[in-house]
């Protein structure tokens, strides 16, 4: 299924790659280290949506922005995001290269969000439960909450762990439908 999606979406993938390249001339893809199933490291691919060297947080963010980032691993209004990147994020098209992660067997189509090592600590004694499941391109959090649901009040953890506990083919099907709806409506997109 992922191979078919890559083939069908290849004109879109190429157009996005060209837009990124034209905007600032940098690399098209961003490689992010995430934690996969059983805690194994996974390199997740995304279309680059930020300016070059955006990982140098201290150089690019104000102290207030840094505090917000370290609290939620996200910023409400991130000054590092490019114009093309903002559109890609709003439409979730920045995630399309993860189809290659699915082809390589590193991600599943549906599962908990692939997270940073530091984020796994926010799951406390449920960390091993989270990591017992292969991360996915989409999941309960992405389809039902996204940026509107954070770690701060524990709701994001609840959603991700609920998926792991209740996963089934039927739930995956519902999540795929909810994902299409969320992407089309840009629910929780930033």
Q: Where do the model's predicted regions map?
A:
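A hydrophobic, helix-centered structural microdomain
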Residues: 1-56, 101, 169, 174-190
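Short hydrophobic "helix-edge" motifs at membrane interfaces and signal-peptide entry regions
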Residues: 1-2, 14, 82-83, 156-157
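Short, hydrophobic secondary-structure boundary micro-motifs
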Residues: 16, 30-31, 59, 110-112, ...
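Gly/Ser/Thr-rich beta-alpha loop segments that engage phosphate groups in nucleotides
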Residues: 27-28, 38, 87, 107, ...
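Short, glycine-rich, amphipathic interfacial segments at transmembrane boundaries or analogous
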Residues: 30-79, 138-159
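A short, structured surface patch at a secondary-structure boundary
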Residues: 71-133, 175-182
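C-terminal terminal-structure detector
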Residues: 76, 124-190
